[in-house]
């Protein structure tokens, strides 16, 4: 049902975010939720005064609803489910037979990078615990590759591992021994380990600079092709910063060419990837139908239509099959965020944006009467979806999450309004002033708060109380990486169309620096924020393990989406290839 028909609050089906009338009256829940509101018809005939509006001339979507509805792989059938179970038994046997800690660590690393580590969580944790307990007795035998892999895999799993384990590879002056640079595999492993650095760990800072220098040397030498590919891949972006699902697709192809490939593990990785992709396609078809029927794309033609790209962000944040509802919510949220962001950045007048922000903050239907028609549609879109999600959540879990979701929306809109005010007054903030607002305007907190509620945290009352008090820092850190990676690739185009100065321009203005120096400063800032976020790898927050993973993955997804340019605003190029490999094309099985 399109948005120009009657809407009731809340709509009843979370799975579709449709505009249907709920079966039960909900006036006892939120008074405004049960009112019947007629959405205005947007048309070329309008009584509103004509305003000179900017246009970003966004490219239309390259992913039509008809195309998305055609995505339907056959990897969900019982024959594949049965084959997966047989392959899992074989891989479990390989885990049991892995001879010695190095072989065990290498197999665990393969499992995780191939994307099937989640199928063997118990076995992996037991094996890592055993290796950790035996560390003191065996560490004298370890080479650089083994030591680095031990550090990376265990720290990533929350074990308390000190970088002091690398001290025996350093000379009496405190520098890394030059002799270890002759080992490209060891260099690669140490390089990857260094990116799990926390603030103050200077040994790992030095390791990163040392290995980067020598890996660039090895990249040009005659080494085994798979090692050369891994070096090139790592220098582009380390494992710890990569979007896991996308990296798994890359690593499956590499693993096929590596020496010592386990054929049954390779088959498991390919089949599991295709089966999960099939589940993703089912969700994507559902979300695309919702967006097509919702009608907002036609009415808000000033905004980016990026449903497929939004679903990429959802996969990047939580890809596991059991989080399908969360991905649907996040994909819909991402598309609504795109509309609201473009309304503030491009289309809305200063006075209109003040009224809209006030309406979202009040969360009251009566406040929309003074809004122009297009803004009424935008307000009702976020109001409808939020109240609907809250209704379903209350029904399923007995907890009212609407106050948290509406506050997240209000905070987001207030941050966008602040930027609009800066543009209108031609004000350039300091970098700190910009970042204090921009981590919210990037939408990271809004996305992560939805991810928390819809990724299955329980018991809810205790989880919410703990979440509100203990997760503000990791949300801010993840959202800051999101903001800064975006700025590095989109700032020039956005400023050209009249957007607020971004982090690069703020630092240029504040420090009197060149653009090249400012870009280097922002890259350094990103590394600094990653170090701070890495503290959460070992933080005692096991009850929020899923949420912490989502926070890390949001930062990783932004890093990958903006690695080759504006992978969200410009719907082609390298990111089109990434989306195709994630959601369109299955891996060929031999």
From Swiss-Prot:
GO CC field: chloroplast
E.C. number(s) listed in UniProt: 4.2.3.115, 4.2.3.-, 4.2.3.177
InterPro entries linked: Isoprenoid_synthase_dom_sf, Terpene_cyclase-like_1_C, Terpene_cyclase_plant_C1, Terpene_synth_N, Terpene_synth_N_sf, Terpene_synthase-like, Terpene_synthase_metal-bd, Terpenoid_cyclase/PrenylTrfase
Motif range (DDXXD motif): 341-345
Residues that bind Mg(2+) 3: 486, 490, 494
Note on how the cofactor is bound: Binds 3 Mg(2+) ions per subunit.
One Pfam family hit: Terpene_synth_C
MF terms in GO: magnesium ion binding; terpene synthase activity
Subcellular location, record wording: Plastid, Chloroplast
Pathway info: Secondary metabolite biosynthesis; terpenoid biosynthesis
Gene3D superfamilies (alphabetical): Farnesyl Diphosphate Synthase, Terpene synthase, N-terminal domain
Transit peptide start and end: 1-42
Keywords carried by this UniProt record: Chloroplast, Lyase, Magnesium, Metal-binding, Plastid, Transit peptide
Annotated binding of Mg(2+) 2, by residue: 341, 345
Top enzyme category: lyase
CDD domains: Terpene_cyclase_plant_C1
Residues reported to bind Mg(2+) 1: 341, 345
Similarity field: Belongs to the terpene synthase family. Tpsb subfamily.
Assembly: Monomer.
Domain free text: The Asp-Asp-Xaa-Xaa-Asp/Glu (DDXXD/E) motif is important for the catalytic activity, presumably through binding to Mg(2+).
Protein name: Monoterepene synthase TPS1, chloropastic
Lineage summary: Eukaryota, Viridiplantae, Streptophyta, Embryophyta, Tracheophyta
Gene (name only): TPS1
